[in-house]
Amino acid sequence: MQVKELTKQYDGKTVVDSVTFAIPKGKVLSLIGPNGAGKSTVMGIISRLIARDAGLVDFEGRDIAKWKSKELSKRLAILTQSNSIQMKLTVRELVTFGRFPYSGGRTTPEDQRIIDQAIAYMELEEFQDRFIDELSGGQRQRALIATSIRCGCIVTRNHTELGRV
């Protein structure tokens, strides 16, 4: 992913000013800075929840705005700071949701294999049948990461999230 000259203003005040960075495939980048520095705005633009005023977000050679949502959801996952889950789900059920863009809700043996791999990778095997609300904060975060790694790309809104895992 490449972000080039990204700019955003609210009511004439620049909150993101010509931000440029690249995230090479397989690498992680943390956006750090004080409150109000524009980190959440940058992530909102990358996730297409906030319109940019100028600049480019290039993902796999295409402007992120030109991706169809269904196609993009297979390649890009967003983890947010607030991760409250309002449904009574087990870890396995939550991770299965990560395959929805691929399976349309009808998981195949290949989907199950990928779900098993994600659970194992995040060391959640012993918790996979527990409900999310029964887990510690770190275990819950690992389950959310397992849900996201199904596409091989994780973008996180909070640089401390991965450090807590």
Functional labels for PLM-detected ranges:
Residues 87, 128-129:
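Signature (C-motif/LSGGQ) region and adjacent switch/coupling loops
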Residues 63-77, 82, 105-108, 112:
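ABC ATPase NBD coupling module
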Residues 32-34:
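The feature captures the beta-strand-to-loop junction immediately N-terminal to the Walker
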Residues 1, 16-18:
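Conserved structural motif at the start of ABC-family nucleotide-binding domains
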Residues 107, 131-135, 139:
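Conserved ABC ATPase signature
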Residues 55-63:
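Conserved ABC transporter NBD signature motif
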Residues 47:
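Helix-to-loop junction immediately C-terminal to a conserved catalytic motif
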Residues 96, 109-127:
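Conserved ABC ATPase "signature" region
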